[in-house]
C-alpha cells in the first residue's frame, strides 16, 4: 500500500510536443515528466501499474532549468526530469483520448 502511493508520486504528467507525438506514432514511445529523484525501475513499475501496459525500455534525462533576466533580477526555473518510455509491440498509451 505504501509502495503504491510512492509510485503515484513518480509520474507528474505527459510531455506534449511535436517530437513526442512523432515518437508515439512511429515508435510506440511516450515522453513523461517524472519526479527528479525517480529511478528507471520506479518509472517502469509506475507506468505498468497505472496504465496496464508492458514496458520494454526506459531512458531518462534531466532538463536543465533556464535563467531569464527581468530588469535587474535574474530568475531561474528549476531542473526537471523526463522519461522516454518505450512500450512493447502492440501496446499504446493515449493521453489525449480519441473520439473514435
UniProtKB/Swiss-Prot annotation:
It comes from Buchnera aphidicola subsp. Baizongia pistaciae (strain Bp). PROSITE patterns: RIBOSOMAL_L23. One of the early assembly proteins it binds 23S rRNA. One of the proteins that surrounds the polypeptide exit tunnel on the outside of the ribosome. Forms the main docking site for trigger factor binding to the ribosome. HAMAP family: Ribosomal_uL23_B. The keyword Ribosomal protein applies. Pfam families: Ribosomal_L23. Part of the 50S ribosomal subunit. Contacts protein L29, and trigger factor when it is bound to the ribosome. SUPFAM superfamilies: Ribosomal proteins S24e, L23 and L15e. The keyword DNA repair does not apply. Signal peptide: none annotated. PANTHER family: 60S RIBOSOMAL PROTEIN L23A. GO terms for cellular component: ribonucleoprotein complex; ribosome. GO terms for biological process: translation. Keywords: Ribonucleoprotein, Ribosomal protein, RNA-binding, rRNA-binding. The gene is rplW. GO terms for molecular function: rRNA binding; structural constituent of ribosome. This is Large ribosomal subunit protein uL23. Belongs to the universal ribosomal protein uL23 family.
Amino acid at each position: 500500500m505504501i509502495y503504491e502511493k510512492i509510485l503515484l508520486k513518480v509520474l507528474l504528467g505527459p510531455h506534449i510536443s511535436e517530437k513526442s507525438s512523432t515518437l508515439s506514432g512511429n515508435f510506440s514511445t511516450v515522453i513523461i515528466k517524472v519526479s527528479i529523484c525517480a529511478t528507471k525501475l520506479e518509472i517502469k513499475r509506475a507506468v505498468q501499474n497505472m496504465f496496464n501496459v508492458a514496458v520494454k525500455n526506459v531512458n531518462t534525462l534531466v532538463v536543465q532549468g533556464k535563467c531569464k533576466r527581468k530588469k535587474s533580477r535574474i530568475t531561474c526555473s528549476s531542473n526537471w526530469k523526463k522519461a522516454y518510455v518505450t512500450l512493447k509491440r502492440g501496446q499504446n498509451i493515449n493521453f489525449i483520448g480519441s473520439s473514435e
